[in-house]
């Protein structure tokens, strides 16, 4: 017996700095690929809860015999050895050799929190019903019927070749890239999109495919989920029609940012290796093979306008240089680049893309927001093929976006006089929630100076700080505006010592930089040369950084969806150990409850309660609710307190020091102007040359 342990058992051992000390066994996203990229795998009952009438009652428990501890030991009796033929082990049946029953599909999908729904058409029918008490006509609105589907889930990527007819080249590329276990969104979407007849044998009308909407967490492999069916559909059509190596545009992928476009192109080229397909990103001067359609109305005013415009065109010099036409099989573009090309022809005309059969909207909720909506809808309308399949992918999707998509699909089918395809929705987990495999922290900093101090404490953690696990680089810092990102970069660029790389370890990326500068910064950050990347919401969506250990929201995001996408830059593909830190000041208190609610729901999914939770219940009760008008204003403009005023400046200098620096810079500028003016005056005072004859 240890007498010291016995005497000290009533004391609490202080673990000062033990949480923040470097732990070599601590899991981090930068440590490597997770063995299991799946987020959910719940235990689901395999039998019915209620017993049927014909089912016999369970057998009563049989009492075990009593043990006599003082009985004599029985003598061992020698038994003759019995020869037993060893059974030959039969090969284990693979998932591809048999189809699961509907009950088995339901259990497997439910264990991974997959909900697949067949969205019905919107019906405006209303039923008039008379009330007996008030004797007034009460209108009862008929709700849309939504049928839940239970397709065959994907157990491994090897099933795509055997059970769903995936191309051998694409299957080999998947093996080469290391894809083994599918994530939840891949488990539910790939069978439906690659071979819907095999995934849903009991459903009709699947010969032309389905229109698809997927809502899945960030980092769950949505890019692979829509690239594989698009590539396989093109290869299948080529083999059926025997078109050979003829290239024509058959799939268009629309993404909101250039960085996401380049990432999709890179992943697509890896999957298309050896197939002969071309995946190209659209640029400003890209010209595609398209048909010209006259959009003008037959009116005299339009004819007069055309005549006047044609006269003006005759006066202008004509450009007879032939334009080189790009012929990709899959085009990845931003909405405005494609819209600019489609409307680049003569007035009152528009180009259309009749050969496109797959239209994919990545981050569909932001593409259908007011900022991109007109361009996205015009791109969609330009795809005039009657066999067009449309799919929508995002981690967040509002009900207004879903209804808009449903109405567009219905109106397009009516205008082209075709039968609409089945519209299927896949939801993984809970809608509009952050990934459950990362930690969330809300830190109150009171002011802008407090934010800067808190960020420097994250850069240089001390052993006495026991506020949780430390945030280790590489990590992202999100700000509200470009000016704030630039100012924060100037303030922090010398905080890393020269021995560790100095100012080269910190960079800022935003839409104000050139394409080459943005590509260079992205390349250095992926290579590990840059440790801290300060950016705006331009990197909040879709961009995959596998080894990012954390995210710092220096400014509170403008919406709950914005927080979900920002926090989703870490914890990709099931990696654990990521941290999402959010700073908020006194000016952010009216809006921060949106973020707190998302954190609370995410931690509830992860099973964190009590002290483990990043947001306590008392904080949720104390924070004010965000009004609808404030929520809309915050989403469009952000926090107005960050846009102007002395309090919004990111600087550690005092007001007196800033005034002195501004006065000094003003004096230097004035001195330069006076020197230039003096030089101009001296040039005018030269020798007089007389009057010319």
From Swiss-Prot:
List compositional bias (Low complexity) regions by residue number: 77-91
Principal localisation: nucleus
Q: Which residues bind ATP?
A: 216-223
Residue ranges annotated as compositionally biased, kind Polar residues, are 16-38
Oligomer and partners:
Interacts with the U3 snoRNA and is associated with the 90S and 40S pre-ribosomes.
Residue intervals of the Helicase ATP-binding domain: 203-415
Q: Which GO terms describe its cellular component?
A: nucleolus
Q: Give its E.C. classification number.
A: 3.6.4.13
- Chain's gene name: ROK1
Residue ranges of domain Helicase C-terminal in the record? 454-623
- What positions does the record give for the motif labelled Q motif? 159-187
Superkingdom as given in the UniProt entry: Eukaryota
What's the top EC group for this one?
A: hydrolase
Q: Where in the cell is it found?
A: Nucleus, Nucleolus
Could you provide one GO biological process annotation from this protein's UniProt record?
Answer: maturation of SSU-rRNA
**Domain notes per entry:** The Q motif is unique to and characteristic of the DEAD box family of RNA helicases and controls ATP binding and hydrolysis.
SMART domains xrefs = DEXDc (SM00487), HELICc (SM00490)
Please name the taxonomic classification of the source.
Eukaryota, Fungi, Dikarya, Ascomycota, Pezizomycotina
Family, as annotated: Belongs to the DEAD box helicase family. DDX52/ROK1 subfamily.
- Protein purpose: ATP-dependent RNA helicase involved in 40S ribosomal subunit biogenesis. Required for the processing and cleavage of 35S pre-rRNA at sites A0, A1, and A2, leading to mature 18S rRNA.
Q: Which keywords, in A-to-Z order, does the entry hold?
A: ATP-binding, Helicase, Hydrolase, Nucleotide-binding, Nucleus, Ribosome biogenesis, RNA-binding, rRNA processing
Could you identify this protein by its name? ATP-dependent RNA helicase ROK1
Q: Which reaction is catalysed here? A: ATP + H2O = ADP + phosphate + H(+)
Q: Where are the compositionally biased (Acidic residues) regions?
A: 294-312, 681-693
